[in-house]
Swiss-Prot record:
A GO CC term assigned to this protein in UniProt: plasma membrane
Protein name: High-affinity nickel transport protein
Pfam families linked to this entry: NicO (PF03824)
Topology of this chain in the membrane: Multi-pass membrane protein
Organism listed in the record: Cryptococcus neoformans var. grubii serotype A (strain H99 / ATCC 208821 / CBS 10515 / FGSC 9487) (Filobasidiella neoformans var. grubii)
One term of GO molecular function: nickel cation transmembrane transporter activity
Segments on the Cytoplasmic face: 1-24, 72-94, 158-210, 261-382, 461-492
Superkingdom, natural source: Eukaryota
Amino acid sequence: MLSRWTRRVNESRLAQRKLTLLGRAIALVVGELLFNAVCWIAAGICFGKTDGILGLALLAWTIGLRHGLDADHISAIDNATRQLVSQGQLPITCGLFFSLGHSTIVIVVNVAIAVSVDIYDKLDRVGSIGGIVGAAVSASFLFLIACLNIYFLVGAIKQRRSMKRRQALGLPPDEDEGDPSKIYGGGCMVRVVGPILRAVDRPWKMYPVGVLFGFGFDTASSIALLAISAIAQRGPNGDAISHGKIVILPFLFTAGMSLVDSLDSILMLYAYATPDSTSPEGKLALLQYPDPNYKDSYLEETVATTLPAEDGQTERHVIEPIDIPQGETEGLETEDNIKAKTGNEILVEEERVGGPSRVDGSGGVGNERVMKAKANTMSSLSIILTLLSILVALSISLIEIMGLIGDNCTQCQDAANDPDGGGLAGSWWRAWARANDQSGYIGAAIVGCFAAILAGWYGAKWGKKKWKARRDANAAIVLEDNEDDAAETPVA
C-alpha cells in the first residue's frame, strides 16, 4: 500500500516536470538535427543510385546554411527576440518560425515545378515583382523593429538611471516609472510602433514575417534550378528521375536554414535574457522539478486582508491565497528568495513591477517574468547588445533599400554599368550592389560580433570573480597571521 502510494506520488511529480531554458534549447537543436538526418536519409534512398543528384542535394543544403546567415535574417531574428524579451517572454523559437515561413515559398515553388516543369519559365516574371515586394517588406520590417527597440532602449536607460538615483537617495521606486515592455502616450511614434508591437507579440508570428521575406523568390529560384537539373538527370537504366522526388531538395534547404536560424535565436535569447543561476531556469539542468515546499512558503503570508489607506489613497487589498498547481510555477521566485510581504512592502513591489501583481487561476504570478525581463533589459550587456542590434538593423535596412533603388532605377543602372566607371554615381551604386551581394558574410560577421561580446563579457566576469576570491583569500590569510602574531606577543 505504501509503495503504491509512493509510486503514484513519484509519477505525479515526474509528470509535473518542465523543461528549463537549457532543456528547451537542447530539445530544439536535437529536433533540428533529427530533421536534417531524416532529410538526408530520404535523399540517400531516392538519389543514391543516380550519379550527380546527391551533389545537387548537398548544394541545396549548403545554400540553406548560407542563407540562414543572411544579414536580414540575423537582424530580424535578433530584433524580434529583443522585443519579445522586453515583454517578459523567452522566445526560443523565433528563428525556427521565421525560417519555416521563408522556406514555405521555396517548398511551394518546387512542388509546383514537380507538378509542371513549365512553372519554372514563369518564375522570372513573378520573381521580378516578388523581389521588389520582398525587399521592401524586409527593409520596412527591419526599420520599424529597429525604431521599436530604440523606444525600448531609451525607456530602459531612463528607468535604470531613475532607479539608481532613487536608490542612492534611499527612496522607494517611483510608481510612475513606465514599464519598458509597454508603450504609453499618444504621439506619432507610439501610433506607428504600437501596431507592430501588437502584431509580433508571439514567436509563431515570425512565420508570416518569414513568408513576406521569401517573396523575393531569389532562393526559390536557386532551388528550383537545382530541381530542374535533377529532373534532367537520368537513372542507371536511363530512366528519368521521378518529379515527386525533387521535393526533397527544398526540404534539405529548409533543414539547413532552420538549423542556422534556430542556433542564432538561441544565441540571441541567451544574450538578452540569461537566467539567474539561482533560478530554476538558470540551473545547468534539462528539467526543473516542482518544489513541494514552495506553495506554502509563498502563500502562508498572503492572508486575505485590507491594508490601511494612506492619505489621499483608496484602500488596497492583498492578494488572497489560491491554489497554484506545482507544475505551473515556472518563473516564480525560489523558496530562499521568498520573503513575507505585507503592507507597504507589497505596494513597493507592485510599483517596482509597474502595476499590481496578478495571480490567475492557471497558476503563476503574471508579472514575475516581466520583472525579470525588465532587470535583463536594463543590464549593461543587454543595453550594449540592443544598441548593436539597432545599428545593424538600420544598416541592413538602408542597404536593402539602396539596393532596391539601384536595381530598379534606369539612370542608376546606367551609371553602375558605365564602361568608363560612371564617375562618383557609378562608384556609389556599385558599392551598394556589392554590399547586397555580401549579405551572407555580413550576417556571419554579426553573429561573430555577438558571440565575441558574450564570450568577452562572461569571461571578464569569471576572471573578476576569481580575482576577488583570490584577493579575499589572501586578505584572510594576512589577517590570520596578524592575529597569531598578536597572540604570541607577550604583554608588557
